[in-house]
A protein has these predicted regions:
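Alpha-helical/coil-rich non-catalytic "connector" segments in signaling and regulatory proteins
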Residues: 1-188
């Protein structure tokens, strides 16, 4: 499964202090590699760099994330997109393993979603499977504001699981009705 530079750095920031340049949001990266001098850079890679003599050229493939590790990069200027600095002297294998864990997490999630669809699992199960990736509460509602599935929402104050059935949920229904996507979908 391919991931974006922004998503990888989002997860890395949970484990390491880091600085980043502008990061791409398109999922183009597929695996990490340790950078070695005089090797041809390959598209779609996350390169871990610890070499003090590393010089970024403008003639490299576009879909690469450069992850520079060590105090020697503390003042390195982030001049190009998809550059990230971990300004600590951390063993490369620890960062490499963390990146591998991120790819494994998303691969397992993707596989579980595919398996659930093959089993014809419910929408509720799909929401539950997504909890490891998107921890926020989620709710899927129909055009008539009936709650089809939800995760981590307290629905006890809604009669018949319908948004708008109580005064507490009127504001939610009003804001949903103001959304241009609702009107577009409703009148198709």
């Amino acid at each position: 499964m391919k991931l974006s530079a922004k998503l990888i750095c989002y997860h890395l920031q949970k484990s390491f202090s880091m600085h980043t340049s502008r990061l791409d949001t398109s999922p183009t990266l597929s695996c990490p590699s340790c950078f070695e001098k005089n090797t041809v850079l390959q598209d779609g890679r996350v390169y871990l760099i610890t070499d003090a003599d590393f010089q970024l050229t403008f003639h490299h493939p576009k879909n690469i994330l450069f992850l520079m590790i060590g105090k020697i990069y503390q003042n390195y200027e982030l001049t190009q997109p998809n550059m990230c600095i971990i300004p600590e002297d951390i063993p490369v294998n620890i960062v490499f393993n963390r990146i591998q864990d991120i790819f494994i997490l998303y691969d397992q999630w993707n596989q579980s979603l595919m398996d659930s669809r093959l089993r014809n699992a419910s929408i509720q199960e799909l929401l539950d499977l997504t909890a490891s990736i998107i921890p926020n509460p989620m709710m899927l509602i129909g055009m008539d504001f009936t709650i089809i599935a939800s995760r981590d929402w307290n629905l006890s104050d809604l009669s018949n699981s319908v948004l708008g059935s109580t005064e507490n949920s009127w504001a939610i229904v009003d804001s949903l009705k103001q959304d241009p996507h609702y009107e577009e979908a409703f009148y198709k």
